[in-house]
Amino acid sequence: MTDMAQSHYQLGMNYFQGKGVERSFSEAMKWFRLAAQHRHPRAIFMLGRMYDKGTGTTENPAEAAKYYLQSAELGYPRAQNVVGQIYIKGRGVPAGYEQALHWFRKAADQNYSDAQYNLGLMYAKGHGVPKDFIEAKRWWGMAAEQGNSKVQFTLGHMYLIGKGVKKNYSKARQWLRQAAEQGLPTAQYHLGMMYARGTGVLQSYTEARQWLQKAAEQNYLDAIYQLGKLLSSGSEEVRDPSSAVVLLKQSATRGHQRSQVLLGQHFAKGVGTAQDYQMAYHWWTEAANAGNADAQYNLGIMYLNGKGVEKDSLEGKRWLTDAADQGHTKAQYCLGVMYSTGKGVPQDMDEAFRWKEAAEFWESL
């Protein structure tokens, strides 16, 4: 690779990024092509990327694969990793685990952490090789030691749930914290939940709030919900119902069902906001229509009691049945009582027994 090739590549990158010049993908491609004529692996890779993404040219997976392979064959580990990925997906090339493994291993042997992660995934899933969590963990360990946050999270989560390894909360916390400190929201969320639940650590709502807040700021919906829940019902030092309502609205409006259920409860009880049964009904209906059993149960009770809606035993029974069919024990007990007393439905002791028995079964699990 000549100095001229490197200069051509750098000029191409300047045009690609708009660095010191007006951004121009056509100019970038021109200079990448000139560098590629001198077998510059990164320039060849960038040509592949431009065809892959349709940047400054028509998207062409086959043409992208051609350039990625050329770059990979010149030993560029980033290209080797991408070639492994396109063989997994069958994008521009015939799908094949054997070829994917070949290229992931080449990049992994150069300590390219993303390839080590992907190679570990192949072993974890048994794609093209016998399933082997020990080998997966070995490759992930190499990547994690290099600071790859995605792999650090994967290892932390494995130790947290005991998947492929014996549960080890100390190691889970170690790897999750390393990934969380690099800003990975999934790691921040799980670390926050360890502190919220006291899983392998001294329970600390303050610490939980800190990590959940970081993930929530990156729009991680489960973190927004759990932070809202913590502020809604956590210990005195973190409880802030009005802030909980603000947070829950953020995730509820984006379709997060558990947020919709909890937000409905805030409106129904008037906690952190003015009591508003219509808003409770609105959010519970959103979640119930999406199949959430808790919301279906809440709507059923609303209709039975006539709070926020006109009293309607048939509509109440319909929602309770939807929830009960999903194994919601409170809904099953409620149906059992309705059928045994004949309240809102014709008395039917067989149905009463069936629903109460179902509730007892689910509670015994």
Each model region followed by its residue ranges:
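Structural signature of tandem alpha-helical TPR/SEL1-like repeats
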Residues: 22-31, 58-67, 94-103, 130-139, ...
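Short helix-capping/linker turns of helical repeat alpha-solenoids
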Residues: 2-4, 8, 17-19, 24, ...
